[in-house]
Amino acid sequence: MHELSIATDLINTALETAKQNNAREVISITVEIGELALINPEQLQFMYQVLTEENLLKGSELIIINVPAVAECQCGYKGPVPDKTTCACPNCGLTMRAVEGRDICLKTMEIEV
């Protein structure tokens, strides 16, 4: 369950950002999660709620935006990844290279100062 470590990292980043901006309250944080990051959004939400009970993020909303996987192949194909387990190109069968949908990124925060 790597959602715990992801939630911890997101919370630490959000707390540091809130501190740097003299926030009195954090209303929400928005996170983009790539399809290939293999994160369970429900588990991440749960971990976020548990880990924010005793800090400035208590009561804040975690907004998750799913980013679809996009890959490209030597044959020229660029698009969705139909088979996430092998990343095989739908045109030629070669293994594709992911170009989008791998990352986890804290995009925005809504705060009260």
Swiss-Prot record:
Which residues are Zn(2+)-binding? 73, 75, 89, 92
Q: Does the keyword Oxidoreductase apply?
A: no
Coiled-coil regions in this chain? none
InterPro entries noted in UniProt: HypA/HybF
Point out the gene that encodes the protein: hypA
Q: Which UniProt keywords apply?
A: Metal-binding, Nickel, Zinc
- Put simply, this protein is called Hydrogenase maturation factor HypA
A GO term, aspect molecular function: zinc ion binding
Q: Which organism is it from?
A: Methanocella arvoryzae (strain DSM 22066 / NBRC 105507 / MRE50)
Q: Look up the domain of life of the source.
A: Archaea
Q: Give the residues the record marks as binding Ni(2+).
A: 2
The family line of this record is: Belongs to the HypA/HybF family.
Question: What does this protein's UniProt record list under function?
Answer: Involved in the maturation of [NiFe] hydrogenases. Required for nickel insertion into the metal center of the hydrogenase.
* GO biological process terms held by the UniProt record: protein maturation; protein modification process
